[in-house]
Structure formats: structure tokens, C-alpha cells
């Protein structure tokens, strides 16, 4: 975000705090039964009062009128219940309906000191005729991670229905899917709810409980919410016992903190069985705890006096009678000394090429940083896996072997930036028939927003005949328009050329989504380097739309002049709900009107996604053709 953006964000934060939008609270009713989820309001809840959304957003539809859209939230010991009702005789099904209509997003947040938070789950629900639609029910954003990659379990249920002249949207969200959030274990929780109502001409209006630019803008670092107050249970049909690990990452020799929450109809002693297995399913601990229950809500914090000596992934399983009352994965980390690790690398830096040293130093720093950022309720399994891989590479290096020699699957390298001395990564993939005596064309592929470059090259982006690299955009939302992004791309290319047999006369730049704009922007910066540009699900004017005016727009003739001598490949899905197909079609028209050769693939059935097999086949043939000239 630019300096101007940070200033505007600061002003926005002050407005939220002064206006007190997060100072209210909503009281959430306790349910002693599990609602039936069919899209209709559960019949036992028809007398509960529904709330209206506080804010209405017509967006670019000034004639749009506000509808009376209501919602109801309640909870059980195992689930959060949500019902939304709209006055309509049909449901509109669109890609990413939670933004494009009809659909909604639920934010569950952990309050922080400044009334905004960067600890949250942003959960998306997009009604769909296909119940297996990938974005039907999904954790869209977690602690500002924007991975869009975590599905909700089958214990979370979502249905929609049209009945009696209205549309109902009903959710039963499993607390286990939003761990550690739970009304009986969390000191306080907050929420926001946003509903996108589809209207004519593929447009939508919006409704929210509190105003929060983060609903639409992934660059907003903190989110706004309203506190939740959960009603204490007045009566229960049966006793409830829940076991919870208060930490899901520990060090070797640490004990296990277990929190037992009990809610009982009577006073009784209940035995609790706790079993811990390693990742090979071998039992390493099997013990029993007697829990004294009383006719009230109780917390019993227990620390298991058992030390695990070996780092790894473990599984916690707790039962009471025939009931499973707690089931968690947790990770035991070794005790690290990163200063000693870096010292070993530097002391041996002259044994192998300097880029291997840079890569190992980058990986050591990355693991240390991620461990520091790890929350108590997160396992850190990916960090442990990353460390084990790094440890293997380090041992190979200390034996004077290059751990990266001969790898043809995608892997990460790093260079030391000559501009700020930071270690910057990129992912590289070599052809299966790679030989250091043969020269290869180079494909530079730029990733999308809110993510890094890891995983981009897991699918071939060139048909397998190119050396492929995916530079990391350290400013993950700036459309590759900053000096640092352009310098990082150039330094990644220089690093590859220094260590691999690249034919520098046969380079192509490509990108997906934000990376599509980045490909246009990067070619514009260095047209002398590339034989062609490929734009996948991109936006030719994205920087001006996201960052404000003053950036190259590739819908303007002045910025298209450098493209006159090279071919351009453009792919887009007509159902793309993230970046509209109209912009891609306008780009194609502008390129052609400027005499630029365009290969276009506008697919009627595709959304915001990578190309289909047929498009890839055409694209790979295009790559081969333009680099053989």
C-alpha cells in the first residue's frame, strides 16, 4: 500500500473508533437443541426476533432500493446457527455470490486493543445449484492470509431455499471449523455479517452489520466488527463435556495444557480418557482423568505431566464414555538456535556457490519469522515440514553437496537483493530433460494477489520445454507496479541466467489475475527482453483501480506502443466474478486496433481460474511458435 493508502487507512480507523461502530454488542441466544438445516428458519425459532442489517450499499446502482433483509444468530455447544431471509421469489446463482450476489460472508473475530483486529475467520457462503461448487462454503480469509484454500468440514451445513415469497439461507457452522473460537473458551468474540443481493445487469447491492472496507478490499490490514455476548445456558437436555488443547504447538519436553469445560444437569464424577498418538498412529500416552461435574458451567485447566522427546505431528483424542469430547492435531517443535544455524551456513559459504548460501539463509530466516508469528492455537504443521526440509538441505550443504542440484520439480531459490540486501525468493522448475549443456527458453510467470509464488509452478505453465520461474511479489497487492517488484523480477531473471543455461533471446512473460496486469506492466518496463506476453484472467487497468490514478493503463494507446512488435495471448472466463471479462475484451479490441497480433480465448463456462486443457494446448503451441522465430 502506498503512503497515501496508509494515511487513508489511518483516517478510516479513526472514523471507526470515533463512530463507535465496534462498541455495540449483540446478545446471542443459547439453543438446547440442534436446528434442522433445510434453508427455512427452524420452527422452534420462529418466535425469535430477527435483526435488520445496519448499512446499505447501492454501489454504482443509485436507483437500487433497499430491501428488508433480516438475520438471526444463535448457538449450541457445538455449532453457531445463522439464518438470513430476503423478500424475493428466486435465488440468483453467480460465481462468488458472496460478493456478486446472492450470497454472504460471516466474519468471526478476536477483539484487539484498537477496536479493529487482524485475527479473524472470514467465511464465505455462495449459494449454488451444484452442491460441490468450490466456493459454496469456505474459509475465504484467515488472519489476513487470503489463501481461499480451506474447506469447511461436513459438520458445517448450509442450505438455501425459496418458500412463501421469500428466500432463506441457513447455516450451522461447527465451532471445530473455527478453532479456537468458542463461546465458552474465548474471552470475547466479535462478528460482522455481509449480504450481497443480486440485482439486474449482473450487478449487486450490499448489506452489512458494521461498515468495513475489508469486505471488498483484501489490502485492508485490520477488520471491523461488533462484539458478541453469548447467553449463558439456562437449561440443558443433557450434560456437556468438552476437552480443548489450549496450545496446539509446544517445544520438546513441554507439558500439555488441557482445558475441560463441563456443563452438567447433576453433580457427578465423569472419567475422561485422553490418548495421544504420533503420526504413525502409535500410542505414546493413554491416561484417565476424573472430572467432577456440578450443575453449572465449569472450567478445569489440567496440565498433563508428560514430555514428548521427539519433534513431529501428534494427535490428541479425548473421550468421556461413548462421546468424543475433543480431537486435535498438535505439533511438537525442536528447540531452535537460529543464530547457530546461520553461523554454520556463513562459516561454510565458500564450499558451494553463493546462491545456495543465500537460499539456505533465506529459509532459516523464513522459518524463524513464521515461528515468531505462530499463534498458540495454530499447529504450525507447515512450518515444521518446512524446517525438516531445510534441515535435510543444510546437512547436505555441510557435507559439501549442493542440495538443489538436479531437482526438476518446483523448488524455491533466493537471491540477495543488491538494492536493500534482503533475501528474496522465487520458485523455479527445470524441464524433465534438463541438461546443463543445453540452452532453454525462459518463462517468467507472475502470481496473483494475496498469495506467494509457491504452488504456481506445480502445474506446467509452458508445456515442459522451458525453464520456468515464478518471482515473489513482496508487495502482494501492488500489481507489480512498485520499483521493488520490478527490481525483484529483474534480479530473479539475472540469478537464473547466472546459474542455468537460459537462451536470453527466448523469454516470455505471463501472469494470472493480478499477475496478468503484472505481465503487461513488466513487459512495458523492459520490452527489449521478451518475445511475447500472456495474460490469464487479468485486468489491463488494475493498478489504477486498486491503487488510485497515475499508473499505466493498458487500455490507453500511449501504453500499448511498446507491444507493437510482439504477440499477446489473452485468456478469460466469461463467468469471472473477481475481474470482469469486459476488461479483457476491451484489452483485446485495443490491442487489435493498434495492429498487435492477439490470440484470444474467452471461455463461456469459466470463472476466475486457470485455463482449461484445450486452452493450455493452444497456449503451449503459441509459446513454441513465438520462441522458434
Walk through the language-model features, giving the residues of each.
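Short amphipathic alpha-helix adjacent to the substrate-entry channel of hydrolases
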Residues: 454-471
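A domain-start/cap signature at the N-terminus of enzymes
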Residues: 296-297, 311-313, 322-327, 331-440, ...
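Short beta-strand/loop motif that positions the catalytic acidic residue
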Residues: 570-572, 576
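Structural preference for beta-rich elements and adjacent junctions enriched in aromatics
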Residues: 21-267, 275
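Gly/Ser-rich "nucleophile elbow"/oxyanion-hole loop immediately N-terminal to the catalytic nucleophile
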Residues: 432-438, 479-513, 524-530
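C-terminal catalytic histidine-bearing segment of alpha/beta-hydrolase fold enzymes
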Residues: 577, 581-629
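Short beta-strand element of the alpha/beta-hydrolase
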Residues: 438-448
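Mobile cap/lid helix-loop segments that gate and shape the active-site cleft of serine hydrolases
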Residues: 455, 525-566
Amino acid at each position: 500500500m502506498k503512503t497515501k493508502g496508509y494515511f487513508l487507512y489511518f483516517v478510516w480507523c479513526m472514523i471507526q473508533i470515533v463512530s463507535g461502530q465496534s462498541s455495540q454488542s449483540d446478545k446471542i441466544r443459547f439453543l438446547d437443541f440442534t436446528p434442522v438445516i433445510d434453508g427455512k428458519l427452524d420452527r422452534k425459532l420462529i418466535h425469535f426476533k430477527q435483526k435488520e442489517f445496519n448499512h446499505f450499499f447501492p454501489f454504482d446502482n443509485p436507483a437500487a432500493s433497499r430491501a428488508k433483509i433480516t438475520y438471526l444468530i444463535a448457538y449450541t455447544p457445538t455449532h453457531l446457527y445463522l439464518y438470513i431471509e430476503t423478500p424475493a421469489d428466486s435465488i440468483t446463482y453467480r460465481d462468488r455470490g458472496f460478493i456478486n450476489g446472492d450470497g454472504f460472508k460471516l466474519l468471526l473475530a478476536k477483539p484487539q486493543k484498537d477496536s479493529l483486529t487482524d485475527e479473524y475467520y472470514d467465511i464465505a457462503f455462495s449459494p449454488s445449484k451444484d452442491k460441490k461448487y468450490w466456493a459454496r462454503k469456505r474459509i475465504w480469509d484467515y488472519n489476513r492470509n487470503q489463501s481461499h484454500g480451506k474447506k469447511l468440514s461436513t459438520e458445517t451445513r448450509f442450505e438455501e431455499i425459496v418458500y412463501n415469497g421469500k428466500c432463506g439461507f441457513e447455516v450451522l457452522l461447527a465451532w471445530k471449523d473455527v478453532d479456537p473460537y468458542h463461546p465458552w473458551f474465548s474471552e470475547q468474540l466479535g462478528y460482522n455479517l455481509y449480504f450481497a443481493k443480486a440485482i439486474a445487469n449482473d450487478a449487486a447491492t450490499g448489506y452489512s452489520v458494521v461498515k468495513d472496507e475489508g469486505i471488498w478490499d483484501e489490502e485492508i490490514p485490520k477488520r471491523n466488527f461488533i462484539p458478541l455476548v453469548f447467553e449463558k445456558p439456562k437449561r440443558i437436555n443433557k450434560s456437556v463435556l468438552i476437552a480443548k488443547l489450549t496450545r496446539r504447538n509446544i517445544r520438546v519436553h513441554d507439558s500439555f495444557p488441557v482445558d475441560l469445560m463441563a456443563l452438567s444437569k447433576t453433580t457427578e464424577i465423569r472419567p475422561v480418557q485422553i490418548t495421544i498418538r504420533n503420526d504413525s498412529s502409535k500410542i505414546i500416552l493413554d491416561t484417565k482423568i476424573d472430572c467432577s461435574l456440578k450443575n453449572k458451567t465449569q472450567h478445569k485447566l489440567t496440565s498433563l505431566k508428560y514430555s514428548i522427546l521427539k519433534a513431529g505431528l501428534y494427535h490428541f483424542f479425548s473421550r468421556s464414555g461413548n462421546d468424543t469430547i475433543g480431537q486435535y492435531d498438535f505439533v511438537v517443535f525442536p528447540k531452535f538456535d537460529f543464530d547457530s544455524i546461520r553461523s554454520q551456513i556463513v562459516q561454510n559459504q565458500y564450499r558451494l556457490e553463493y546462491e545456495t548460501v543465500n537460499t539456505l539463509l533465506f529459509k532459516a530466516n523464513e522459518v524463524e519469522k513464521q515461528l515468531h508469528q505462530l499463534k498458540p492455537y495454530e499447529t504450525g504443521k507447515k512450518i515444521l515440514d518446512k524446517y525438516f526440509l531445510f534441515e535435510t538441505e543444510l546437512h547436505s550443504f555441510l557435507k559439501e553437496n549442493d542440495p538443489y542440484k538436479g531437482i526438476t520439480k518446483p523448488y524455491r531459490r533466493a537471491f540477495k537483493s543488491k538494492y536493500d540486501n534482503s533475501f528474496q525468493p522465487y520458485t523455479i522448475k527445470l524441464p524433465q530433460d534438463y541438461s546443463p549443456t543445453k540452452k532453454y527458453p525462459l518463462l517468467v510467470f507472475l502470481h496473483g494477489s494475496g498469495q506467494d509464488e509457491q504452488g504456481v509452478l506445480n502445474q506446467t505453465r509452458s508445456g515442459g520445454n522451458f525453464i520456468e520461474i515464478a518471482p515473489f511479489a513482496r508487495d502482494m497487492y501492488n500489481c507489480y507496479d512498485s520499483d521493488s517488484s520490478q527490481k525483484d523480477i529483474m534480479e530473479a531473471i539475472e540469478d537464473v541466467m547466472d546459474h542455468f543455461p537460459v537462451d536470453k533471446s527466448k523469454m516470455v512473460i505471463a501472469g494470472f489475475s493480478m499477475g496478468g496486469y503484472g505481465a503487461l506492466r513488466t513487459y512495458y518496463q523492459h520490452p527489449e527482453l521478451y518475445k511475447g506476453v500472456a495474460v490469464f484472467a487479468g485486468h489491463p487497468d488494475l493498478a489504477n483501480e486498486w491503487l488510485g490514478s497515475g499508473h499505466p493503463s493498458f487500455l490507453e494507446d500511449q501504453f500499448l506502443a511498446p507491444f507493437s512488435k510482439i504477440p499477446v495471448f489473452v485468456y478469460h472466463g466469461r463467468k469471472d466474478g473477481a475481474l470482469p471479462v469486459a476488461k479483457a475484451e476491451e484489452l483485446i479490441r485495443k490491442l487489435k486496433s493498434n495492429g498487435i497480433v492477439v490470440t484470444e480465448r474467452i471461455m463461456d463456462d469459466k470463472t476466475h481460474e486457470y485455463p482449461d486443457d484445450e486452452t493450455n494446448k493452444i497456449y503451449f503451441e503459441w509459446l513454441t511458435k513465438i520462441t522458434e522465430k
